[in-house]
Amino acid sequence: MFHLKRELSQGCALALICLVSLQMQQPAQAEVSSAQGTPLSNLYDNLLQREYAGPVVFPNHQVERKAQRSPSLRLRFGRSDPDMLNSIVEKRWFGDVNQKPIRSPSLRLRFGRRDPSLPQMRRTAYDDLLERELTLNSQQQQQQLGTEPDSDLGADYDGLYERVVRKPQRLRWGRSVPQFEANNADNEQIERSQWYNSLLNSDKMRRMLVALQQQYEIPENVASYANDEDTDTDLNNDTSEFQREVRKPMRLRWGRSTGKAPSEQKHTPEETSSIPPKTQN
């Protein structure tokens, strides 16, 4: 019995030694395989350069998350990695102009102006026509200045620069601003003013106004006994303007009134002295 127990203890010790040796050999084999193949650092760098969905999980169960979400390869505070910039192929247009700082393809500034430092993206037929017209105008100006040095430059500039007639202004929902011809409107206004002046200066209108004035001023009994000849002579002779209308009695606040006409309110010192004092009964 004692001999069997001793053999069992030796077998267990040997088994433990074998397990320990196997566990010690596994990391060495992993290091050898990693040294023969690509290292994990290069794999991690490659993963950082690409867009991947999840985090990187290492064999030691450590989780490494991507520090930069965007593929711009930027470090903190706006700095870029100098090692990664060499592998990037920059997209360029028309020479050495970089595409990245240009936001819009039209290269336009505010208020329709273009950046003079950058060339135009596309050349149209309108640009060619404009350039040709400018060259022709400059040649004509040089010829005119060479032949007639004392000529009037104002007439030349008036002929060269003419205002372009714009299209009629359009409003929203298909409406348009009504455009009237200026000549017709001016002629109508002139004719209307001439007609008004002729009416004011005519004898018929003046007689009608004088008749209205006399109708409201002369009492009815006097107007009934007046002869037709007298009225005609009065109309011909009376060229005075309308008299100022007599104002109504002065009104005070809160509905009160003086009860007197404006002519009766103020009396001169002579009138006040001539008025006898009231006697008390």
From Swiss-Prot:
Any one GO molecular-function label of the UniProt entry: receptor ligand activity
Main location: secreted
Subcellular location as annotated: Secreted
Skewed-composition ranges (Polar residues): 271-281
Signal peptide: 1-30
Keywords for the protein's UniProt record, in alphabetical order: Amidation, Cleavage on pair of basic residues, Neuropeptide, Secreted, Signal
Tissue expression summary: Stage 17 embryos show expression in the two brain hemispheres (neural cells located in the dorsal posterior region), the connected ventral ganglion (pairs of neural cells along the ventral midline) and the peripheral nervous system (expressed in the antennal-maxillary sensory cells). In the brain hemispheres of the feeding third instar larva, expression in neural cells is located in the dorsal-anterior region of the protocerebrum.
GO cellular component annotations of the record: axon; extracellular region; extracellular space; neuronal cell body
Tryptophan amide, modified sites: 173, 254
Entry-annotated residues carrying Phenylalanine amide: 77, 111
Propeptide cleavage-removed residue intervals: 31-64, 115-165, 176-246, 257-281
UniProt-annotated stretches for the region Disordered: 137-156, 226-281
Biological process according to GO: adult feeding behavior; circadian rhythm; determination of adult lifespan; larval feeding behavior; multicellular organism growth; neuropeptide signaling pathway; positive regulation of cell size; positive regulation of ERK1 and ERK2 cascade
S-S pairs: none
Additional notes on this entry: Flies overexpressing sNPF are heavier and bigger than wild-type. But loss-of-function flies are not smaller than wild-type.
Functional summary from the UniProt entry: Plays a role in controlling food intake and regulating body size.
Protein family (similarity comment): Belongs to the NPY family.
Protein's UniProt name: Short neuropeptide F
Gene this chain is encoded by: sNPF
